[in-house]
Regions:
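Transmembrane beta-strand segments of outer-membrane beta-barrel domains in Gram-negative
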Residues: 1-126, 205-210
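C-terminal transmembrane beta-barrel domains of outer membrane proteins
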Residues: 26, 72, 90-239
Length: 239
């Protein structure tokens, strides 16, 4: 932010939670977490409109949020959290989350994430599906948002929002097979390998407002529903 690049907006949230976690499976591949505690959300305005240095662009305004105190309960099940599109480990991973809030802010929210990745030599294939649903009357900060920095590149920042959403992402990565060894600087200092490669990624997302109340929240956020499946693709060089 000091250099004028702050591409996100924020909610002032404070929590005091108790967490209990239990590992599952012989190799602790699964995790079951239960969280419960007090939370407080506050709608805040940015204190700075832009960086104090004459660099970059003005900061984003924070999107509308409903202030309130509430008791938050979360149950999360994860299987193979080490399997992700961003990592090289192959396999199948799953994450299921249920969240409930009671108090000045009230809502229920459920999310599911399913990831698969396979490596074949220098070729890596991966896919990830995210689905979610929240209460139509949930505060705006609990709605699902899609856009440039939210798993749907090629569209505006948080262009789409709603109380029901799904995003499917696929990726094909091909390494060039060069510069794959770590770089030795000194006897004790090594740098990771450059390992260049090319990646093709495809994203498809859908979000809707299930009730007039949900649509009113989408309008207040300055977003829109997708209306139909929106997609984008990118070809990038990675190191």
């Amino acid at each position: 932010a000091l250099f004028g690049r702050d591409e996100y907006d924020y909610v002032d949230r404070r929590t005091a939670m108790l967490l209990v976690q239990h590992f599952l499976g012989t190799d602790w591949q699964g995790q079951l977490r239960v969280e419960s505690g007090f939370a407080q959300d506050r709608d805040v305005r940015p204190r700075w409109a832009e960086s104090p240095l004459p660099l970059g662009s003005p900061f984003r305004d924070n999107r509308p949020a409903t202030s309130g105190d509430y008791w938050r309960n979360v149950v999360t099940f994860e299987w193979r959290p080490d399997v992700a599109l961003e990592f090289l480990r192959p396999g199948v991973g799953t994450k299921l989350t249920y969240e409930r809030a009671d108090g000045q802010l009230r809502y229920e929210r459920a999310e599911g994430r399913f990831t698969v990745r396979q490596n074949h030599g220098r070729l890596a294939l991966g896919a990830r599906l995210d689905v979610g649903i929240t209460s139509p009357t949930a505060p705006p900060q609990q709605f699902f948002e899609l856009g440039a920095n939210q798993n749907l590149p090629g569209y505006d920042y948080k262009q789409f929002a709603g109380d029901q959403a799904a995003v499917l992402r696929g990726q094909v990565y091909r390494g060039f097979g060069i510069f794959g060894a770590p770089l030795r600087i000194t006897q004790r200092v090594w740098l990771p390998p450059i390992a260049p490669g090319v990646a093709l990624s495809v994203q498809a997302g859908y979000v809707r407002a299930s009730t007039p109340a949900a649509q009113a929240t989408v309008n207040a956020l300055g977003s829109e529903v997708t209306g139909h499946v929106r997609s984008s693709a990118a070809l990038t060089l990675r190191f």
